[in-house]
Amino acid sequence: MTIEIPVPFKAHNIEAPSQMVETSKSEIVDMFTQAYLMRRLEIASDVLYKGKFIRGFCHLYDGQEAVCVGMEAALTKEDAIVTSYRDHCTHLGRGGTPL
């Protein structure tokens, strides 16, 4: 299926990307499933942190799951990613497990 991005991208000194995106229903459902799992992990982490089961700092990523899912859609598993914190979803996106 082809999806058209209605608002054009603004680019500076580069060619703007296409406003047409090719995808499939299964790819969209997979992205939603990944984002949903990431959100559930963040909510569970919040509960554990507030229950004092996680010590130190717990920087949560809820509300940003689509960033990680979109990034993973554009990258390959061979591409390197560097994070400093709020990396629970990156762990899942790279193929890690919630446990």
Protein language model features and the residues they cover:
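Cofactor-binding active-site loop characterized by glycine-rich and histidine/acidic residues
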Residues: I43-L99
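Conserved acidic/glycine
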Residues: M1-V67
